[in-house]
């Protein structure tokens, strides 16, 4: 028998201490990893409910277990909210992650050995877009497109590759691209060779939901996304379509269950429903616009200070900072900024001379800092602090710059806590 006063503290103090240390880190460090954000207390509340106890293989009204009448309501609400939020006619809220959502789409639309065309990792693509170490590169004939000399997608080159290789599926979307993608052009290219168009909007789903970035739903055969990142929900995946194609939708359903997953995580699906509903609130659009404005403010400072921003700027929530010209590695810059309590991630840049474990760039994103209340002024200051550390690294010793910036970071984090 359980009692509701059971606590982790006192039962496993080592685990509890690590958990509390992470809470402290999130409050005391500035988060600039583009794929991270802070979930609302409502989202976290849903994930801590007794829904975690319920097994519910199947779909609402068609379960393989009894006692699902209440979780059916939960999943139906999540589906309803997802469709309404994105203007979709189909939604599957069961994928445990964005990668599993992509894997289900592969399983539904293409066969092992088929050709797929996606963005390369060093151009800003994702592992599941055909990278060699991933299932998408191991089990499929993956052809990759990159960026032109200006750091932009060359649609004519994508079209040429499509005509040459005749892919069964083309993947648009990114994990590190800072410009607006022409979804209609991608659909035109796909239609020209008879390919399916998959759009992975994991990074920009929140921007799309708020209407501050063009939606791929009118153009793609299928759209996948995560539910965290700019959506500020729980970690999970989502498959959407506006094609009104019952045959394809049936394939998506069976590719998720039983094709790649068993029981859905009902506590996470409840949290997804909450995040979809939160994204329909009026202040969510203002938040997403601020995310973009903050990213623009930061990119502008880096450019003014002589640093190269891939693609020349940003029109979304992130940008890539190339350190090739400065002779710095992403790995070293990541570590130096971490010592100043600024969290970023090292990232490959186009034609990167370094290995993927070292890299020559940083990926910088503003969703998390915007959630905690940063505006353009704070973000411009923050970019300047980062430049101070990078400048000092080029002189050989950044320890004093790191200490100075750390003090500034502590002050602004105390003024703008994540959870008040």
Swiss-Prot record:
It is an enzyme of class 2 (transferase). The modification N6-(pyridoxal phosphate)lysine is found at residue 229. Its cofactor is pyridoxal 5'-phosphate. It comes from the Bacteria. Its main location: cytoplasm. It catalyses: (6R)-5,10-methylene-5,6,7,8-tetrahydrofolate + glycine + H2O = (6S)-5,6,7,8-tetrahydrofolate + L-serine. Keywords: Amino-acid biosynthesis, Cytoplasm, One-carbon metabolism, Pyridoxal phosphate, Transferase. (6S)-5,6,7,8-tetrahydrofolate binds at residues 121, 125-127, 355-357. GO terms for molecular function: glycine hydroxymethyltransferase activity; pyridoxal phosphate binding. InterPro entries: PyrdxlP-dep_Trfase, PyrdxlP-dep_Trfase_major, PyrdxlP-dep_Trfase_small, Ser_HO-MeTrfase, Ser_HO-MeTrfase-like, Ser_HO-MeTrfase_PLP_BS, SHMT-like_dom. One of its GO terms (biological process) is tetrahydrofolate interconversion. Its EC number is 2.1.2.1. The record marks 228 as: Plays an important role in substrate specificity. It is found in: Cytoplasm. GO terms for cellular component: cytosol. Pathway: One-carbon metabolism; tetrahydrofolate interconversion; Amino-acid biosynthesis; glycine biosynthesis; glycine from L-serine: step 1/1. Catalyzes the reversible interconversion of serine and glycine with tetrahydrofolate (THF) serving as the one-carbon carrier. This reaction serves as the major source of one-carbon groups required for the biosynthesis of purines, thymidylate, methionine, and other important biomolecules. Also exhibits THF-independent aldolase activity toward beta-hydroxyamino acids, producing glycine and aldehydes, via a retro-aldol mechanism. Belongs to the SHMT family. Homodimer. This is Serine hydroxymethyltransferase. It comes from Chromohalobacter salexigens (strain ATCC BAA-138 / DSM 3043 / CIP 106854 / NCIMB 13768 / 1H11). The gene is glyA.
């Amino acid at each position: 028998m359980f009692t509701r006063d059971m606590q982790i503290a006192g039962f496993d103090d080592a685990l509890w201490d690590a958990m509390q240390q992470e809470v402290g880190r999130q409050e005391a460090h500035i988060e600039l990893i583009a794929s991270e954000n802070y979930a609302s207390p409502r989202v976290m509340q849903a994930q801590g409910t007794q829904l975690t106890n319920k097994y519910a293989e199947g779909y609402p009204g068609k379960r393989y277990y009894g006692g699902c009448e209440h979780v059916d309501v939960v999943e139906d609400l999540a589906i309803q909210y997802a469709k309404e939020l994105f203007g979709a006619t189909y939604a599957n809220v069961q994928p445990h992650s964005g990668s599993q959502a992509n894997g289900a789409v592969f399983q539904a639309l293409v066969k092992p050995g088929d050709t797929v065309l996606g963005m390369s990792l060093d151009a800003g693509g994702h592992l599941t877009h055909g990278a060699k170490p991933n299932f998408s590169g191991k089990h499929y004939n993956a052809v990759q497109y990159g960026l032109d000399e200006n750091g932009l997608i060359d649609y004519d080159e994508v079209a040429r590759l499509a005509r040459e290789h005749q892919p069964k599926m083309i993947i648009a979307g990114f994990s590190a691209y800072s410009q607006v993608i022409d979804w209609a052009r991608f659909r035109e290219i796909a239609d020209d060779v008879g390919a399916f168009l998959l759009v992975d909007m994991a990074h920009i789903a929140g921007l799309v939901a708020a209407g501050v970035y063009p939606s791929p739903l009118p153009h793609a055969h299928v759209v996948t996304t995560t539910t965290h990142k700019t959506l500020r929900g729980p970690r999970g995946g989502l498959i959407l379509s506006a094609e009104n194609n019952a045959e394809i939708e049936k394939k998506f359903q069976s590719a998720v269950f039983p094709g790649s997953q068993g029981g859905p995580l009902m506590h996470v699906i409840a949290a997804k429903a909450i995040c979809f509903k939160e994204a329909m609130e009026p202040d969510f659009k203002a938040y997403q616009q601020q995310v973009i404005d903050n990213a623009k403010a930061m990119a502008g400072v880096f450019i003014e200070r002589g640093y190269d921003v891939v693609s020349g700027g940003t029109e979304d929530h992130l940008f890539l900072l190339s350190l090739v010209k400065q002779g710095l590695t992403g790995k070293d810059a990541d570590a130096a900024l971490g010592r100043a309590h600024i969290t970023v991630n090292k990232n490959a840049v186009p034609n990167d001379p370094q290995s993927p474990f070292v890299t020559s760039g940083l990926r910088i994103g503003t969703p998390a800092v915007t959630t905690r209340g940063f505006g353009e002024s704070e973000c411009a200051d923050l970019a300047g602090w980062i430049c101070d550390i990078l400048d000092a690294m080029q002189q050989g010793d950044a320890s004093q710059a790191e200490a100075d910036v750390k003090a500034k970071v502590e002050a602004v984090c105390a003024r703008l806590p994540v959870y008040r």
